[in-house]
């Protein structure tokens, strides 16, 4: 067992509740934050359901990179809250800023917060009393939002990775994590107990899932090799249930407050898994679900507009429609759904092509599927220093989609308009942007080289779905239509990109769409790899596999695969000796700058 990085104090349940009682008594001596917020009347609207609430929340945004900004390399209790607030480049939050955001079309503000790292000594001595000054500053920002007439979401947001304590090898550390979680939310809930139902608590950000065994300054013995997905799900469910129970136990308005439950990794597909469950609740119709949407990451999450893959084909718009439609699983059960983060994130070189179309289609579908959302923004779109959008079209989009513009319209009308607009967008979208692209049908198979460069700046069709439009500008690809057993060549030329080469590799694989369906049992036998015209020798043997039983795959560099999938891997001759998911060694000198890469392989039945 590795040495733990924080002193652990043994805590019994009796000690926890004794500490929380002290916290409650201390907070009772602090003037209620609600008293400083004249616009918040403390009213809890009787009979208001979670679905009805989300319709009232309109469109929202995040106060990104602000109160969650933290530095785990220099934890210094007692720093001024403003030290953190501006630490990641954002300006000091003001009343004028929130009022202008509301006027710009945002009816809801999500305030991400790093409570443990910025406002407790959990990493130093295992204590989790929140610094009153930090709590005061968050409350002050909440008051700004309430004065502006906005709904407010408060969460605990990554927060230095302390969540990995839940997955520690030490039962003592795991118990401390749960004690700290209960203690944190008790303090927050008591502080905001008198606020109206315009203030919503969110159980986590993206941490309830595979990050529950993340190593950090808080814990370096997380059980990354021991926790199964079933255990991840069970633990995430337990934490969410603890969140609900903790808030309800604080009484007052918190007995009926709307609570936002973070989905599994906030991923739509993983949250729709039957292993993930919404918590039980003593309040009726007061639970909301939180998920995020950044698909595809090669476009929405690309660090530069120049390096982002193309987006805007018929298939792209249809995919967004299908993904958001999956959330009806929850709305049909009466849960409100908040997409707590989404965006075609601006690159460091500006907005991406089709940003407006991405956001408009997203908002149309939210109208149709009865969802609300909060844009992830760190002054990339609404520039807080300027108190204005960076783009007139985005300003018009959000300015025309707020709650005020929907006044007097019933939901059926809004829903029908959203569906009609989305359908028109899909109908007008091109099938492909790529000239001479191979069109995949149910009756053919296509081979291609999936790729992410080492800086995640360049990408081509990563994933099991073949998409020739998912390509960074300037890349030229050679794909191959599979017509039967034979020899084929695929590859990529990076010389036309802005940087002129692929800076190493972060992920690479050969894919054959429909390979498992049309050619079951076939193997990909690599004959030759050429990088910049020279033969490159693979380090180990590549094996054939499939993640979805539709697309055949050979991993060339996939560091996320930690073991060979026995039973789902095959090679010529039947054995798996020498098999590796990383036959390309990214430390080889010829991998540092790749201008061209071509791979020739046989596609033949396994012998």
Question: What does each model-found stretch correspond to?
Answer:
Residues 1-39, 44, 48, 373:
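Gram-positive cell-envelope targeting signals
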Residues 35-108:
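N-terminal carbohydrate-binding accessory modules
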Residues 64-93, 122-130, 173, 298-319:
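Acidic/histidine-rich helix-loop elements
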Residues 88-109, 119, 124-158, 162-203, ...:
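An active-site-proximal structural segment forming one wall of the substrate-binding cleft
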Residues 92-114, 323-330, 363-365, 372:
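Catalytic domains of carbohydrate-active enzymes, especially glycoside hydrolases
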Residues 175-309, 325-344, 368-371:
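Active-site region of glycoside hydrolase catalytic domains
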Residues 349-433:
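Aromatic-rich peripheral "rim/lid" segments of glycoside hydrolase catalytic domains that contact
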Residues 491-520, 566-590, 594-598:
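Extracellular beta-strand ligand-recognition surfaces/modules
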């Amino acid at each position: 067992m590795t040495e733990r990085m924080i002193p652990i104090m043994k805590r019994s349940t009796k000690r926890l509740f004794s500490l929380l009682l002290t916290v409650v008594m201390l907070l009772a001596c602090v003037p209620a934050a609600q008293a400083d917020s004249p616009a918040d009347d403390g009213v809890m609207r009787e009979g208001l359901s979670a679905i009805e609430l989300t319709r009232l929340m309109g469109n929202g945004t995040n106060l990104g990179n602000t109160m969650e900004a933290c530095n785990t390399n220099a934890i210094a209790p007692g720093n001024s809250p403003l030290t953190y607030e501006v630490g990641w480049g954002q300006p000091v939050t003001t009343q004028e800023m929130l009022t202008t955001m509301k006027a710009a079309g945002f009816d809801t503000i999500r305030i991400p917060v790093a409570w443990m790292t910025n406002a407790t000594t959990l990493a130093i001595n295992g204590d989790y009393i929140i610094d009153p000054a930090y709590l005061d500053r968050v409350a002050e920002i909440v008051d700004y939002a309430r004065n502006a007439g906005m709904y407010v979401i408060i969460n605990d947001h990554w927060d230095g990775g302390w969540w990995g304590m839940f997955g520690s090898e030490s039962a003592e550390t795991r118990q401390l994590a749960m004690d700290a979680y209960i203690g944190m939310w008790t303090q927050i809930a008591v502080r905001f107990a008198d606020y109206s139902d315009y203030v919503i608590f969110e159980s986590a950000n993206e941490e309830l899932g595979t990050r529950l065994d993340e190593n950090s300054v808080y814990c370096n013995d997380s059980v990354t090799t021991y926790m199964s997905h079933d255990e991840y799900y069970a633990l995430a469910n337990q934490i969410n249930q603890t969140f609900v129970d903790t808030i309800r136990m604080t009484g007052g308005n918190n007995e009926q407050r709307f609570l936002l439950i973070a989905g599994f990794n906030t991923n739509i597909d993983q949250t729709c898994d039957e292993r993930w469950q919404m918590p039980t609740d003593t309040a009726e119709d007061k639970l909301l679900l939180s998920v995020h949407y950044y698909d595809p990451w090669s476009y929405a999450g690309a660090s530069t507009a120049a390096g982002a893959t193309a987006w805007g084909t018929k298939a792209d718009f249809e995919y967004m429609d299908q993904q958001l439609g999956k959330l009806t699983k929850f709305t049909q059960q009466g849960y409100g759904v908040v997409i707590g983060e989404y965006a075609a994130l601006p690159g460091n070189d500006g907005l991406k092509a089709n940003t407006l179309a991405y956001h408009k289609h997203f908002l149309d579908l939210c109208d149709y599927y009865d969802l609300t959302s909060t844009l992830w923004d760190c002054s990339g779109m609404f520039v807080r220093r300027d108190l204005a959008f960076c783009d007139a079209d985005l300003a018009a989009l959000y300015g025309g989609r707020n709650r005020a513009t929907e006044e007097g319209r019933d939901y059926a009308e809004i829903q029908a308009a959203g569906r009609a607009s989305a359908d028109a967008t899909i109908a007008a979208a091109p099938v492909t942007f790529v000239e001479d692209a191979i069109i995949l049908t149910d009756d053919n198979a296509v081979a291609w080289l999936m790729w992410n460069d080492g800086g995640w700046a360049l990408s081509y069709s990563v994933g099991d779905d073949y998409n020739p439009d998912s390509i960074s500008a300037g890349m030229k690809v050679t794909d191959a239509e599979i017509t039967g057993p034979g020899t084929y060549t695929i590859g990529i030329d990076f010389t036309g990109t802005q940087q002129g080469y692929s800076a190493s590799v972060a992920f690479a694989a050969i894919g054959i769409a429909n390979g498992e369906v049309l050619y079951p049992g076939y193997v990909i036998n690599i004959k030759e790899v050429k990088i910049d015209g020279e033969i490159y020798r693979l380090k180990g043997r590549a094996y054939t596999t499939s993640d979805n039983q539709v697309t055949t795959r050979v991993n060339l560099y996939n560091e996320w695969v930690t073991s060979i999938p026995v039973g789902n891997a095959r090679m010529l001759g039947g054995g798996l000796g020498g098999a590796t998911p990383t036959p390309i060694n990214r430390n080889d000198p010829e991998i540092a700058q790749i201008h061209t890469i071509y791979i020739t392989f046989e596609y033949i039945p396994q012998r």
